[in-house]
Amino acid sequence: MRRRDFLPALALSAAAAQTSTPVERKGRLKQTVTRGVFGRNMSLEDSCRLAASMGVKGYDLIGPADWPTLKKYGLVPTMYNGPGGTIPEALNRTENHAALEKSMNAAIDEAAANGVPSIITFSGNRKSTGDAEGADNCVAFLNKVKAHAEDKGINICMEYLNSKVNHKDYMFDHIAWGVDVMKRVNSPRVKILYDIYHAQIMDGDIVRNIRDHFQWIGHFHTGGNPGRHELDDTQELNYHFIAKAIADLNYTGYVGHEYSPSQGRDPAADLKQALEIFDV
C-alpha cells in the first residue's frame, strides 16, 4: 500500500474500531453511501461496518452478490446497478430494448424478493440519435416495463448526468429532457435519479429545479463541485440548504453520497461531515 493511501485507510479503521455504539441520525432524510466515499483501500465489509456505525441507512450501486454483506450490517441495498444498461448504451436506442427488457423485468423480480427499492437506468449517449427521437425511445421502453415495476413496488430511476465534464454525449444532460420523459411515462415507479453534482454543472438552479420537478424525482446523489469531492467549503454548493429544501418537501426516498475523497483527506471524517450536513 502506498503511504498516501495508507493514512486515510488507517484513519478509517481507527474510526470503525472506536465507534461501538451506532450513531442514531435524528434528521428527516435517509442517507446512503457509495463505495467511492471510503477511498481506494477499504473492503466492502469494513465499509459496511463503518457506514452502519455512522447512522447510514443504505448502500447504493451494489449488485446481488454483495447484498448479504450489506444486510449483515443492517444496510438496505438501495440502488441496484447493472440491469438497466450502461451510461453510453441504454434506453434511447431501440436495438437495446429487447435485451434490456428481459434484464429489467428479471431485476424487478429480484429486487422485490430482496428488499431493494430501486434500479438504476440511463438514457445512453446520443451518438447519431436526436434528443427527440431518444426521448421517444426511452418513453417506449419505460412504458413496456412500468406495469411490472408498479406491481412489484420497485422504482426505476433514470440518472441525470453532465455531458460537459464527465460524460460527453450523454443524452439526459438537462432536467427538462428528463422531466418530459417522466411526464409521458407518468408512472409512480419511474423516476429521475437527480445527481446534484451533475445538475449543478449543466443547469444549476438546484433548489428551484428540485422544487419544481419534485414529483418526478425518486433518488438523489451528492458530490462537491468542482471535482466531485467532499461536501465541505472547498466546493461551491450549499448542501445544508439543499438538504433542508429536500426535507421540507417531505421526501421519503434516499439521498446517496457519491463522491471521492481528495488526496490526503480523512475519508471517515469527510463522510461524518456529509452525514451531519444532511441530518436536517
Q: For the regions a protein language model found, what residue spans apply to each?
A:
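Histidine-acidic metal/acid-base catalytic patches
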Residues: 2-32, 37, 41-52, 116-117, ...
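Short acidic, glycine/proline-enriched helix-loop-strand junctions
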Residues: 68-80, 154
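Active-site-proximal loop/turn and secondary-structure-junction residues that shape catalytic pockets
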Residues: 37-39, 63-65, 83-85, 125-127, ...
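Active-site acidic/histidine proton-transfer and metal-coordination neighborhood
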Residues: 10, 16, 23-25, 90-191, ...
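Catalytic domains of carbohydrate-active enzymes, especially glycoside hydrolases
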Residues: 47-66
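Anion (oxyanion) recognition and catalysis
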Residues: 52, 71, 112, 150, ...
